Amino acid sequence: MGDEDLIELKFRLADGTDIGPSKYSQFMTVASLKEKIIAQWPKDKENAPKMINEVKLINGGKILENNKTLSEARSLITIGELPGIVTTMHVVLRPPLFEKKKEKLQNDPPRKSHCVCCIL
């Protein structure tokens, strides 16, 4: 793999801190890139993601799909067009869906099944 196959990326977290920059193969999938981001997540940050489905990568206003490679995403957006330029991608965390549902059920009072209709 030559240098022309590598893309230099850094990842901007929601609080403004960065992961990287590092070089990645343009043939790497977005899903494996997310796994690397999770592995490099700063240890001092709260709410670190555990699964790739909790991470969204945004570049050029587009959310990158897990099954695409970086070279496929390059055709949709501008990634590393100029040599020596570091491309910044934004990292957005999405809490797992089942946690939201569990939290909502715990916070909501139990519903009573009686009618509140009034017929006049």
Curated annotation (Swiss-Prot):
Q: Where in the cell is it found?
A: Cell membrane
Annotated consequence of substituting residue 117 to S: Loss of prenylation and membrane localization
Q: Which domain of life is it from?
A: Eukaryota
Q: Which GO terms describe its cellular component?
A: plasma membrane
> Which residues, per the entry, are lipid-modified as S-palmitoyl cysteine?
115
**Ubiquitin-like domain ranges (all copies):** 7-72
| UniProt cross-references to Pfam families, sorted A to Z | Rad60-SLD_2
**Induction profile:** Not induced by pathogens, cycloheximide and ozone treatment.
Q: Which PROSITE patterns match?
A: UBIQUITIN_2
CDD domains assigned: Ubl_MUBs_plant (cd01814)
**Where does the signal sequence lie?**
none
Identify the propeptide residues. Answer: 118-120
Give residues with lipid attachment (S-geranylgeranyl cysteine): 117
Q: Can the keyword Isomerase be found in this entry's annotation?
A: no
- Entry's InterPro entries? MUB, Ubiquitin-like_dom, Ubiquitin-like_domsf, UBL3-like, UBL3-like_ubiquitin_dom
**Matches recorded under SUPFAM superfamilies:** Ubiquitin-like
Tissues with expression: Ubiquitous.
Q: Which residues carry this modification: Cysteine methyl ester?
A: 117
- Name the UniProt key words of this record, in alphabetical order: Cell membrane, Lipoprotein, Membrane, Methylation, Palmitate, Prenylation
Report the function annotation for this chain: May serve as docking site to facilitate the association of other proteins to the plasma membrane.
Other remarks? Heat stable and remains soluble at temperatures exceeding 90 degrees Celsius.
What is this protein's record name?
Membrane-anchored ubiquitin-fold protein 5
Query: Which species does this protein come from?
Result: Arabidopsis thaliana
Read off the lineage from the record: Eukaryota, Viridiplantae, Streptophyta, Embryophyta, Tracheophyta
Task: Give the gene symbol.
Answer: MUB5
